[in-house]
Regions:
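Intrinsically disordered, low-complexity, positively biased terminal segments
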Residues: 1-166
Length: 166
């Protein structure tokens, strides 16, 4: 359900759940940071709430993809990216973000973060938390604080919205 503002969206949803004969309301596409989650009375407020990952992305041209998106924070981090499908993406890159824009260039400096292209794609969407990935051991940090620096730059005020399907 799309609406012009969060207040309108919540008002429409409240109207739906307040109908006398309405036993359930089902929403198929809810973003990870949708205001609806704040409206529910805790994690058990929805009887069948579960994430559905129907929006995936494949970065094809890493430098252009990273330069094409906006950023909330800034960073200067050297990342080592693995990409078995597209060798042009693989390698060591310096990611410098300032003023909401990124400059990405090949680097011979020592890597500060090591991650796969899929993890970078998830962060590119703004919902793959790099700090959580690091804590889980799926990406590596060679310089203390480098993952946090990179994630602060990649975070967005509103995460990507899952598509309704194709």
């Amino acid at each position: 359900m799309l609406a012009g503002s969060a207040a309108v969206r919540l008002a429409l949803l409240r109207r739906l759940v307040d109908f006398d004969l309405m036993a359930t309301v089902t929403l198929k596409t809810i973003g990870a940071d949708d205001v609806l989650w704040q409206w529910l009375p805790g994690p058990r407020g929805a009887s069948d709430a579960h994430p559905y990952d129907n929006l995936w992305i494949r970065l094809v041209d890493l430098p252009r993809a990273l330069a094409a998106r906006g950023y909330e924070g800034s960073c200067d981090v050297v990342v080592d990216v693995t990409d078995e499908l597209l060798p042009a993406n693989a390698g060591t890159w310096r990611v410098t973000v300032a003023g909401g824009e990124a400059v990405v260039s090949p680097s011979t400096d020592a890597a500060e973060v090591r991650l796969g292209i899929a993890h970078l794609g998830s962060a590119w969407l703004g919902w793959g938390n790099l700090s959580a990935m690091h804590r889980a051991g799926v990406i590596a940090e060679e310089r203390p604080g480098a993952v946090s620096d990179l994630w602060r730059a990649f975070r967005l005020d509103v995460a990507a919205w899952p598509s309704p399907g194709f």
